[in-house]
Amino acid sequence: MSVKLKADEISSIIKERIENYNLSVDIEETGKVISVADGVANVYGLKNVMAGEMVEFETGEKGMALNLEESSVGIVVLGKSSSIKEGSSVKRLGKLLRVPVGDALIGRVVNALGEPIDAKGAIEATETRFIEEKAKGIMARKSVHEPLQTGIKAIDGLVPIGRGQRELIIGDRQTGKTTVAIDTIINQKGQDVICIYVAIGQKQSTVAQVVKKLEEYGAMDYTIVVNASASDAPALQYLAPYAGVTMGEYFRDNSRHALIIYDDLSKHAVAYREMSLILRRPPGREAYPGDVFYLHSRLLERASKLSDKLGAGSLTALPIIETQAGDVSAYIPTNVISITDGQIFLESDLFNSGIRPAINVGLSVSRVGGSAQIKAIKKVSGTLRLDLAQYRELQAFAQFASDLDESSRKQLERGQRMVEVLKQPPYSPLPVENQVIIIYAGSQGYLDDIPVSAVTKFEAELYPYIEAKYPEIFEQIRNKKALDKDIEEALSKALNEFKATFSAE
């Protein structure tokens, strides 16, 4: 039996096949390594590569295109460059760097690419985000108005921090900068704030100690640690803060609150300088490249308090800068001071004289935190800054003058006690209601007849006494967030009763 084929049927089938024919050809643009040194590869042949694009070397190492020149491309290697040789092939990946974000990262230690380095298995993240994002515009933001309590009396009373603020912690080495940051993380327990600690160029042992301390206080339950240590490639140290802020933005954009600590941006700038000089970019002041200001401004501008329309989430940044011999007028410190909303200045002289945290009250300032402070602490610490400044002035004068008048002597004695009140051991942040009570006691003269050496003992015994006899004082300050007449009367009564039973010995 013969099958008759109609010509029009055949032509329609052929036509359909031609129309549906899908020729997908994978065109991979590859290049060759001309030279490689110090974590930077010079590559020839990647004519269409974009700035910031990811590439892959034949050894499996990833890289990022940073310098686009006429005949070659400068690529920073994200990992070990020792296996890459001259003549190795490099292929474009056609994508920008992304890092995993979300709740799966909480409690983990990751590198600058978001890969786990804590031997606790893979991270099951459901979402990734670009590492470089544009900071939110003016209309997307809201002014800072909620407090972010650090648990440190000197900070919450004198240089308060609000959610969505950028507050710089600046000081010489060994002045307790990291301790202030860790105390702040520990104090966020139960506050529904996700913390991100970014370690840049630190020793592995130092980072291990920080993680151990956070675990000890149960803070790793709400903390992500991003580590690009001193032994990592400069490119990873450069990327670590951007990876951290990307993870923080996820929580901010989902109507949650996050806190990010960059420890520290001095080493970040040094890593960027190292990369830039190897890429042969022209050096500027202190051999830093011309765009080192933009390096930090685009990072810190990503911290913000979002408007109610966008969910009212917040991302607070606490960058750390290490100064050399207290020189805050160096290039990187002045840059970051001008970008942030205030600074907490730690001094080695204060630290060595036993005043810890070693905060210089005169030089420390919070430009927007005042509007975020709760009324109670604002009331009790209102004149504290002025009193301490006058005390410091009198103290300098008293070294030369032996006969002081009665009011000056009283001011000097109260100042000594207030300095004692503001001292605090590390890793012991105080709830805000406790801070209100002790600062009130100091500023209202309840400590004037207590020996200076007994102030710490007075404070340690005061809280349990009030908790046992007048628990409503704590509760009312916590709930009302203000110090009204009734609370003040009850507090005054409690302090007088406690003083009658207190023994300085």
Curated annotation (Swiss-Prot):
It is a peripheral membrane protein. It comes from the Bacteria. ATP binds at residues 171-178. Transmembrane segments: none annotated. It is found in: Cell inner membrane. It is an enzyme of class 7 (translocase). The record marks 364 as: Required for activity. NCBIfam families: atpA, PRK13343.1. This is ATP synthase subunit alpha. It comes from Campylobacter fetus subsp. fetus (strain 82-40).
